[in-house]
């Protein structure tokens, strides 16, 4: 989906495996090392819920992303960040694991 502004157009799309390095780098720029998800975490997130992992690009550069699974669990708990077992598209709850925007 293209988003037109007065200046440069933006593209909003679902993330793919080709985005892993850029997503990991942006996460590292936005969060302290103890809190930032690593490449392997993003890899399983993409495999588990790619259809709920969105990236925003400007001039071909990834500048922002948001991701999180749908689940049957009402509350976000720490264990969700470490295991794809909570992913369930038949659930009623959309979790947000992270939002990162280029500084």
Q: Residues of each region from the PLM?
A:
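Hydrophobic adenine-recognition pocket in adenosine-nucleotide-binding enzymes
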Residues: 15, 99-101
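Short secondary-structure boundary/capping segments within folded domains
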Residues: 14, 44-47, 55
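A short, polar/charged loop/turn motif at coil->beta-strand junctions and beta-hairpin connectors
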Residues: 6-9, 62, 90
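Conserved acyl-donor/pantetheine-binding loop and adjacent beta-alpha core of acyl/acetyltransferases
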Residues: 66-99
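Short acidic N-proximal helix/loop "leader" segments that mark the beginning
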Residues: 1-5
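Conserved GNAT-fold acetyl-CoA-binding loop/helix
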Residues: 24, 28-49, 75-80
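Conserved beta-hairpin
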Residues: 52-69, 102
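A short beta-loop-alpha structural element at the N-terminal edge
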Residues: 10-23
């Amino acid at each position: 989906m293209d988003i037109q502004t007065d200046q440069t157009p933006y593209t909003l799309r679902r993330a793919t495996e080709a985005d892993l390095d850029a997503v990991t780098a942006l996460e590292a720029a936005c969060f302290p090392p103890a809190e930032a998800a690593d490449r392997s975490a993003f890899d399983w997130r993409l495999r588990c819920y790619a259809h709920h992992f969105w990236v925003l690009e400007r001039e071909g550069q990834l500048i922002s992303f948001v991701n999180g699974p749908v689940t049957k669990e009402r509350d976000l708990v720490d264990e969700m960040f470490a295991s794809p077992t909570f992913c369930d598209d038949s659930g009623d709850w959309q979790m947000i694991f992270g939002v990162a925007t280029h500084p």
